[in-house]
């Protein structure tokens, strides 16, 4: 598949760059809410930053799609497990928004062990004119109260309040790698290396174990759970991926403990490509249902694959993300990069998929035209409202002027976390400790 150098379809203009300095500020998750008006990021310091989309202004047409900081709060603190003598990092592993049901917004955030439910509310009015209290809230001297008055609401500067509503703890022995909210809007699941639990959003003291792959003897362990997600429309269906590259679709109507999957999606290994690294690079790092619910998107180290729920034998589409790294797997193993967990994302119409790579590159694949493009998210190449130019990695041979050699790639600059606006061509890219937001100015609607 050749790279598409036609920039008309991928004319993403850079909107905003929020740069930070320390290790704690490295972004560890990015998530749009269901309308795309809010964007949440979590970092290694346990903080959650919420950005809100600016309303479109007639005076400033370029402001459409820009996001400003809406609220920042500390979600998790570092803890210590005294029974196991283990430190529990404050790093936010995942954020998931709940569908909005009233004026408030709600989201779930999790670190390795504890999931928290947060409520985000706005206040732009305050009551004034109490009979028994003064403006500072102190009780008045009753002898000075000579008349009754009706308290009134007076406008005030907008205040965003974030409050913890629930804390879901003690549900996991191993590190939580994913959470997913069910379409019934009442339950969600959380997955660690060996188990998946089902929680009710209103109940914090118990959860139901729906998948348990822990063997009686841990020496017999051959695979771990890497990601899981509920089906977007059928509340009884969910999928989980494994370190062996397989996907298991489970139906909660079949049994309380879904140890027996309904469908197993697995691609037979090509014996000619077998190597020491085969199992490592086949491990699925992310799985996402399409918005339609018909397909699943998975990411392993070198590829992204699209699976049809009706065909278990093999993926219907396979896209090479950075196949030029296949010859460098040995050095990538030595520096631990081979264990990096890249995420993937669908656009709103399920026609384009996106995933990250090294050197601050990210890749887009158009499923209809079969075109693909490599773009770069970096402070050097991205200035506000500039058009992103396609990049090309060269493996030996002739090089064009803007090509970059595979030997020049910076493996410390990696894009692991990406998100796509649910209805528009706006994408959020986390590049280490910088957040980039790009918008397609040519095609403002999802094609």
Curated annotation (Swiss-Prot):
Q: Which UniProt keywords apply?
A: Repeat, WD repeat
Instruction: List residue spans for each WD repeat.
Output: 22-61, 87-128, 171-209, 220-260, 279-317, 334-375, 410-446
Highest taxon of the lineage:
Eukaryota
Keyword Repeat listed? The answer is yes
Tissue spec. comment = Highly expressed in brain.
GO CC, one annotated term? protein phosphatase type 2A complex
What the entry lists under InterPro entries is as follows: PP2A_PR55 (IPR000009), PP2A_PR55_CS (IPR018067), WD40/YVTN_repeat-like_dom_sf (IPR015943), WD40_repeat_dom_sf (IPR036322), WD40_rpt (IPR001680)
Q: Name one GO molecular function term.
A: protein phosphatase regulator activity
Q: Which family does it belong to?
A: Belongs to the phosphatase 2A regulatory subunit B family.
- Relate the protein's function as given in its record: The B regulatory subunit might modulate substrate selectivity and catalytic activity, and might also direct the localization of the catalytic enzyme to a particular subcellular compartment.
Subunit structure, briefly?
PP2A consists of a common heterodimeric core enzyme, composed of a 36 kDa catalytic subunit (subunit C) and a 65 kDa constant regulatory subunit (PR65 or subunit A), that associates with a variety of regulatory subunits. Proteins that associate with the core dimer include three families of regulatory subunits B (the R2/B/PR55/B55, R3/B''/PR72/PR130/PR59 and R5/B'/B56 families), the 48 kDa variable regulatory subunit, viral proteins, and cell signaling molecules. Interacts with IER5.
Question: Under what name is this protein listed?
Answer: Serine/threonine-protein phosphatase 2A 55 kDa regulatory subunit B gamma isoform
Gene name for this UniProt entry: PPP2R2C
């Amino acid at each position: 598949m050749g790279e598409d150098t036609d920039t008309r379809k991928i004319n993403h203009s850079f909107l905003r760059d929020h740069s930070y300095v320390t290790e704690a500020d490295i972004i560890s998750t990015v998530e749009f809410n269901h309308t795309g008006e809010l964007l949440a990021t979590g970092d290694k310091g346990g903080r959650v930053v919420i950005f809100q989309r600016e309303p479109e202004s007639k005076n400033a047409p370029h402001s459409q799609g820009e996001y400003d900081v809406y609220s920042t709060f500390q979600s998790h603190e570092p803890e210590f497990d005294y029974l196991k003598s283990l430190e529990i990092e404050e790093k936010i592993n995942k954020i998931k928004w709940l569908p909005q049901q009233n004026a408030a917004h709600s989201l779930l955030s999790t670190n390795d062990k504890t999931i928290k439910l947060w409520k985000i509310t706005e206040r732009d009015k305050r009551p004034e004119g109490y009979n028994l209290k003064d403006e500072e809230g102190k009780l008045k001297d009753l002898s000075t109260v000579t008349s009754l008055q009706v308290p009134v609401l007076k406008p005030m500067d907008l205040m965003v309040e974030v409050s913890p509503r629930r804390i879901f703890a003690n549900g996991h022995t191993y590190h939580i790698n994913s959470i997913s909210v069910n379409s019934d809007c009442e339950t969600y699941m959380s997955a660690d290396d060996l188990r998946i639990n089902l929680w009710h959003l209103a109940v914090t003291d118990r959860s139901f174990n729906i998948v348990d792959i822990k063997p009686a003897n841990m020496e017999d362990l051959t695979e771990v759970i890497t990601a899981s997600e509920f089906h977007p429309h059928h509340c009884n269906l969910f999928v989980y991926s494994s370190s062996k590259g397989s996907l298991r679709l489970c139906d909660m109507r079949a049994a309380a403990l879904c140890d027996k999957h309904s469908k197993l999606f697995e691609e037979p290994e090509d014996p000619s490509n077998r190597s020491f690294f085969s199992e490592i690079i086949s491990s699925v790092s992310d799985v996402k249902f399409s918005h339609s619910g018909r397909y699943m998107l998975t990411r392993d180290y070198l590829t992204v694959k699209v699976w049809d729920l009706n065909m278990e034998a093999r993926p219907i589409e396979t896209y090479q993300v950075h196949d030029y790294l296949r010859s460098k797997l040995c050095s990538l193993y030595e520096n631990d990069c081979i264990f990096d967990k890249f995420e993937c994302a669908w656009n709103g119409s399920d026609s384009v998929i996106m995933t990250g790579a090294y050197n601050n590159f990210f890749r887009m694949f158009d499923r209809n035209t079969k075109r693909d493009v490599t773009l770069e998210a970096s402070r050097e190449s991205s200035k506000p409202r500039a058009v992103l130019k396609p990049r090309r990695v060269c493996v030996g041979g002739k090089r064009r002027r803007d090509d970059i050699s595979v030997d020049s790639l910076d493996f410390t600059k990696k894009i692991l976390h990406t998100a796509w606006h649910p209805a528009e061509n706006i994408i959020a890219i986390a590049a280490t400790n910088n957040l980039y937001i790009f918008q397609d100015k040519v095609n403002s609607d999802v094609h």
